[in-house]
Amino acid sequence: MALTTYDELKTSVADFLNRDDLTSVIPDFITLAETSLNRTLRHWRMEKRANAVADTQYTALPSDYLEMIRLSIIDSTTSTIENVGQFEISKLRAQNNNTTGKPVNFTILDGSIELNPTPDAAYDVQLLYYGKIPPLNAQTTSNWVLENYPDAYLYGSLLHTAPYLQED
C-alpha cells in the first residue's frame, strides 16, 4: 500500500473503512487530522522565519502562524524582544506613560504582535515561529508529514470518521 499522495491517502481511508459512500467527506476528515496535528505537533520542519518592519504598536502575524519561538530586532546589536502576557504589557505601557522607543517586550493580541514601547522608528524584526503544516489538497498532493509520517495522516483521518459514522 503506497501512501505518498493526497489521492492515495483518500483511497486508503476509504479502504480502511471498507466504504465507498464517503468519498465526498474524506477530504474533511483529512482536514480535521491536519487541524489536530497543527494544534499538538511541534517539529523542526514547522519552524519558519519571517522578516518585517515594525514601525507601529501592532504588527501583523504571518497567515500560517501557530506559535512564537523568538522575536528579534535585527540591527547592529541584534536583540531579542521579551514575550510577556497581555496584562503585563498593559501594565508596562502604563508605567512608562505609553512612551515610544526601541521595543523590549511583545505579546500576541488579536492576530498581531503588540510591541512595547511603541516603536519610535522603523525597526527590522525577525520572527522565528511555528507555522502550519502545508494542507493537502488537489494542488498540494504531498507535504513533509505525509512523506515522513503517513501513519499520522491515516490514523488522524480515521479517528475523525468515528463521530461521523456514530462510532464514537
Where does each model-flagged region fall?
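Glycine-enriched, solvent-exposed interface loops adjoining structured elements
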Residues: 1-168
